[in-house]
Structures are given as structure tokens and as C-alpha cells.
Amino acid sequence: MSFPYFISPEQAMRERSELARKGIARGRSVIALAYADGVLFVAENPSRSLQKVSELYDRIGFAAVGRFNEFNNLRSGGIRFADTQGYAYSRRDVTGRQLANVYAQTLGTIFTEQAKPYEVELCVAEVAHHGETKAPELYRITYDGSIADEPHFVVMGGTTEPISTALNESYKENLSLADAVSIAVKALGAGVNGAEPRTLGPATLEVAVLDANRPRRAFRRITGSALEALLPEVDSSESSNEAEAGAEKGSGES
């Protein structure tokens, strides 16, 4: 007589966690950090069409790492939820904490009930409405639905330890935009285990801000000459080689 294969709940959760962590580890890193005028997002992303950073609502931004199709579905769902809430009640009733909780509940349900967890990690950020002085809010949501608020910065992706170490050494409150971009880009290029730091140029970076000084929609992308002016000096040939080596597939990790 044969017996059905049994796996304990603890082992099932461990295997799901391992699967999700491996998927996230293959993605290039993203930084979200608070600066003097709001929140800065800097992602290592050579693709111009598959974006890791986007706007969710008037004062709320979104960043993610992992499988693009999965976090893009979550991004789209968050936008629809925010639009519905803002239409039914008031635009000011839509908050970053509210959206972070929705994402946490969704990912927690997927992790425990579906056959495969989402291989994603998310950040939801919010800045104060124009004229208010509330500090920026940063929320990290992991693949299993865990949620944490971070006071200064969030680092996500495959190589987070050297990036977090670099930011802990260089980050200060109320940085200017230029200084914030500089330390974020240098942190993204930090070497692992003593390796030489990498030089990242405009071709390999996706940069955006939530600017609390903007009257309604705070989200703004920084591209082209505006981005080049904020970056440390880079060698153009190195930047080009970095972009060619980092070409990504649309269905894979981002």
C-alpha cells in the first residue's frame, strides 16, 4: 500500500521562502532614500521600457525588484485601488501606508495559499502634500507579506549588504538632490567582498523623485542631460559597456 507524499507546513514555507529569495537575488538593486525635498529612487536598470520605479498616486511612488511580470501586476493593481479610493472618497484619503498594507495582504495571501509565491520585493514611498512639513514615509514589503517602515532609506535586490554598508557610512538627513544621487549611485556600484567598485552611467540607471515642492503630482523622472548633470564624472566607454552587458529579458528578473 502506497502512502501519499507528505510535506510539513514548516518545510513548505521554507521552500517557498527559498524560491522567492533566489528570484529576488537575481534582480539588480534599487535604492529609495529620503532627501531634503522628498524621496529619491535610483535603480540599476539598463532597460528603458521595463521600469522598476513608477508613480502610484499624487504623492505616492513605487519601486520593486524581482520578476517584472509579477511586480508590474502589483503596480497596476495598486494604481487601480488608489484611483478607486480617491474617486469614492477624497484624493487625500489615499495614503502610502494604506497601499503598503494592501500589498502586504496580497503578498501574504499569495505566499500561503498559492502554489508559487511571488518573487518580488516592493517599496512604497509617500511625501507630504504641498505646504505640509510631514517627513517622507518609506515602506518595505517582502515576498511573504511582511511590512516594515524605514526612516531613511530602503535597499532591495540581489546585492544589498555592500550597498547598505555604503549608505550607512555616507547618508545624512536633508541631503540635496545632487548629493543624494551621488551617494546612491556610488552605493549601487559598491563592490562585494573587496571587489573594485563599478561605475554606473546614465545608460544603466533609472532615476526618479517624489518632490514635495510640486503642488499636486509629486512624481518626476530624471533623464537625459538632467540626470547627467547630477551624476559623478563617468567614463562614457565604461557606461556603454555596462549597458551592453546588462541587457535584460522582459519575462525575467529585473
Swiss-Prot record:
Cross-referenced Pfam families: Proteasome (PF00227)
Protein's GO biological process: modification-dependent protein catabolic process; proteasomal protein catabolic process
Chain residue ranges for the region called Disordered: 232-254
Regulation: The formation of the proteasomal ATPase ARC-20S proteasome complex, likely via the docking of the C-termini of ARC into the intersubunit pockets in the alpha-rings, may trigger opening of the gate for substrate entry. Interconversion between the open-gate and close-gate conformations leads to a dynamic regulation of the 20S proteasome proteolysis activity.
Keyword list, A-Z: Cytoplasm, Proteasome
A molecular-function term among this protein's GO annotations: threonine-type endopeptidase activity
InterPro entries hit by this protein: Ntn_hydrolases_N (IPR029055), Proteasome_alpha (IPR050115), Proteasome_alpha-type (IPR023332), Proteasome_asu_bac (IPR022296), Proteasome_sua/b (IPR001353)
Localization: Cytoplasm
Gene3D superfamilies to which the protein is assigned, alphabetical: Glutamine Phosphoribosylpyrophosphate, subunit 1, domain 1
GO cellular component, one term: cytoplasm
Pathways involved: Protein degradation; proteasomal Pup-dependent pathway
NCBIfam families: 20S_bact_alpha
HAMAP family: Proteasome_A_B
Family (UniProt): Belongs to the peptidase T1A family.
Role this protein plays: Component of the proteasome core, a large protease complex with broad specificity involved in protein degradation.
Protein name: Proteasome subunit alpha
Lineage: Bacteria, Bacillati, Actinomycetota, Actinomycetes, Mycobacteriales
